[in-house]
Amino acid sequence: MTGGTERVAAAVDLLKQGKAEKLLISGVNEKVDWILLAETIDELPEELGDKITLGHVACNTRENALESKAWLDRNGFQSLRLVTASYHMPRSLSEFKDVMPDAVIIPHPVFPQTVKHNEWWKWPGTFALITSEYMKFLVVVLSHVLPFSTTSFNIETAGSK
């Protein structure tokens, strides 16, 4: 999932190491293309271009999961590595497991350098980030047990190049 060059770089590294056959970068701004992506990643081999899909449909974590499921189904995969920031992983995992309960989801957390992991409560920015993410996580958990849907998502275009 997008949200920082560290996440994308980690995902590309997994692809380079052969730990994934293909890569979907979900939630990419519509202005971002392969050329701009290559400029932001150090040592991005051109031959990886055919293995990377830029998903321009998703606008939130739930939609990232839906876009990823559509891409997984289209490619015939039953498992994925979920690469996102460590603080975002619990909510992401919850959404992904809800959308694709039969898929094997391997979490691969990234630890952004800008987020203070030790004594995070002493850093106002990190405190706000962690508490906000926790509140969103609680909302997601509740949404999975309550009988309503808040997503209007075009599954037809999800996860396509």
Predicted regions and their residues:
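A structural signal for short, hydrophobic/glycine-enriched beta-strand patches
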Residues: 1-124
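Hinge/cleft segment of the Venus flytrap/periplasmic-binding protein
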Residues: 151-161
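A transmembrane-helix-recognition feature enriched in membrane-embedded lipid enzymes
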Residues: 123-153
